Amino acid sequence: IFFFFFDHGSPLYDFQTLCHYVDTDLAIIDKEKPDVIVGDFRLSLSVSARLRSIPYISICDAYWSQERALKPPLPVMGFTRYAPIALSQFLFRRIAPFAFRLHAQPLEKLRAKFGLPSLGYDLRRCYTDADLRLFANFPALFPEVNTHVGADFIGPIAWSPEFTGDLSFLAGEGPLTYITMGSSGNPKVIEKLVPILESLGSRIVITTAGKPLSFIPKLPTTRIFDYLPGSAVCQKASLVICNGGSPTTNQALCCGVPVLGIAQNMDQLLNMEAIANYGAGIVIRADRLARATLRQAIESLVTDRKYTNRAQHLARNQGLESRPSTLSGHILDQYTKRKFTS
């Protein structure tokens, strides 16, 4: 349901849902009595935590930061497959402020219900409001975001589940491409990618998140799994192809691997825009998947070392040396502030 609303441009949560979330939040808060609350896109927590006067830390993405100007890219919608992108983008930029205000309305209504001040119907603030916002991104991707007492970079979160299976197949000869479109991606995209990669001599590892594929690979060097530990695969890969979302791009870039992001929604497009601007990847809109376009992008990423060099530079220089090295440092800081100011 979440991805349906996100991809179709509808508000992610309605007022009644957010009210229910606040009730659930408060029940847990009153039972557990936390000193600090840490949330990840749980929009109701910006209300619930304030109602109990508990410091709230939000883990979020810097491309939604109010410290940078938001130039909203046109997401993929039904009509964009047929409309000229330049014209559609021009028109979208002009109606986006009204659309964002509509998206912000449920949370603004929630805040008004509980006597909290308005966030100015600023969607960036509605998505990230907290006492401390921690950006789970590489600082180098967002040089225009200046950190301060209420906002800092915690660095990319590249989590993978523990895996006890055999990964020896990753050690074969030749370049390896890792394809994963995630739970929100369209598996039909994979069917377009595999023949191109096979023709270029790449070994291929595909994870489908349990979604069925309607084709059978021609070569034994193409292997398909429901799930694999992404970070482990990225360590052996020379290219990662995904939906452009930050969970997978963080895994790839932490391993110094360039990314081809086939992006659909605004979140993915904003993330990949920063990566492409840095030179560590290429973004293709999911409504512009011509075979020639895909092949050109893949060949560029595989043959032009500049993309790999930029990805490796990013992995080596995360720019976090002067900041608290762990989330616990930020939590302790918020706890201390509460302890001595309450």
Each PLM stretch: what is its role?
Residues I37-L51:
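An aromatic- and histidine-rich active-site surface loop
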Residues V36-F41, F225-A274:
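A donor-sugar binding/catalytic signature common to diverse glycosyltransferases
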Residues R291-S342:
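C-terminal amphipathic helix plus adjacent low-complexity
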Residues A140-L239:
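Donor-nucleotide binding loops and adjacent catalytic segments primarily
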Residues I1-D35, Q89-F90, Q105-L107, T222:
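Phosphate/nucleotide-donor binding subsite
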Residues I57-P143:
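Active-site-proximal region of nucleotide-activated glycan assembly enzymes
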Residues D35-V36, L132, L176, L239:
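Structural motif
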